[in-house]
């Protein structure tokens, strides 16, 4: 496709219109020392076929899950996404849609968001879900802000092992909110110590936060943690993986006041880290404190169902300092993909995905621990992810496995810890699992 540049006459007309004589006058405010003094080192002009070939060659340097067996996890998982998800989400009515300021003219977009909210409420056992957040980390941080607002208290206690990146986002949000203290509970055998937590939660605690499954893949003692939070009048916030809820209890059923999650694992590809989807759900008591958009269903003057943005006095339509948030855009397309995927799966389908992921993860863990020098780092129960102690550095295993077109897992040394974090989804076959074990045996 040719690019038609501006002519000299057109450039002169534009400069004259904005009131400068020449291009040098236009950039006069840019200091000389920061201006580029030489021509850019660009390739010569190419046609579309040549550009396409060049980009494909550059892209081939990447390793991707389409041609590698992946055991990567730590928040981004290689679950199967039916072709129908992308086909439906790519329809022009959805793909190019943006909720306008007169939102009610976009009934299709609003209904899709309403259905997403309804599905998330059922999945998490909660009363209200918003239209989505940027990602799981921002959803958790916003949940903490809700707790500070609702309780009027100052501190946050993290009960178990939170994802390190999520911890960083939480710290950033709370620092901006007045440098609120965050207390980390001690970790014993991969999960938070309930006994130690008892000594950390007080009448000054706004919320107790737990991730389930946690960063190591282990299952926290969520019911005991929730009881401690309630005893001290703190809100109980759970960050739960949506796929895990196919087999684990919904957070609302064991007392969560706010439940959040990273929605990448339902309907959204790993995509080199984003865009992802932040799930945020609350009990009815906190509906006016929830950030972001809420879609509600009502009747029009003729008695037909209609969808609206509701309770907008919480949001950016009022004075900034009184709003619960100033988020206007959300991850609506990612949310659409999530609700399409979950709708295609249904209740039995999500249970099947969760069960197969869990069973295959435990099969692989059992096989790996039979190898000399390999062992599970923690004895706590896990869902689809676990940490292995290895006889050689995890980085070495990861590097060697790449030659076999295998992503072996996540090296925990990035966070100053030992071990290889391995995740297994329903996509992995028995042959792939057994082959992985054989390759590990040759490295041990």
From Swiss-Prot:
Record bears the keyword Oxidoreductase: yes
Keyword Signal included in the entry's annotation: no
GO molecular-function term, one example from the UniProt record: glycine dehydrogenase (decarboxylating) activity
Pfam families: GDC-P (PF02347)
Keyword terms of this UniProt record: Oxidoreductase
InterPro entries: GcvPA, GDC-P_N, GDC_P, PyrdxlP-dep_Trfase, PyrdxlP-dep_Trfase_major, PyrdxlP-dep_Trfase_small
Source superkingdom: Bacteria
GO biological process: glycine decarboxylation via glycine cleavage system; nucleoside metabolic process
Catalytic activities: N(6)-[(R)-lipoyl]-L-lysyl-[glycine-cleavage complex H protein] + glycine + H(+) = N(6)-[(R)-S(8)-aminomethyldihydrolipoyl]-L-lysyl-[glycine-cleavage complex H protein] + CO2
E.C. numbers: 1.4.4.2
Cross-referenced CDD domains: GDC-P (cd00613)
Known partners and oligomeric status: The glycine cleavage system is composed of four proteins: P, T, L and H. In this organism, the P 'protein' is a heterodimer of two subunits.
Reported function: The glycine cleavage system catalyzes the degradation of glycine. The P protein binds the alpha-amino group of glycine through its pyridoxal phosphate cofactor; CO(2) is released and the remaining methylamine moiety is then transferred to the lipoamide cofactor of the H protein.
PANTHER family, per the entry: GLYCINE CLEAVAGE SYSTEM P-PROTEIN, GLYCINE DEHYDROGENASE (DECARBOXYLATING)
Family membership noted in the UniProt record: Belongs to the GcvP family. N-terminal subunit subfamily.
The protein, known as: Probable glycine dehydrogenase (decarboxylating) subunit 1
Organism of this sequence: Chlorobaculum parvum (strain DSM 263 / NCIMB 8327) (Chlorobium vibrioforme subsp. thiosulfatophilum)
Gene assigned in the entry: gcvPA
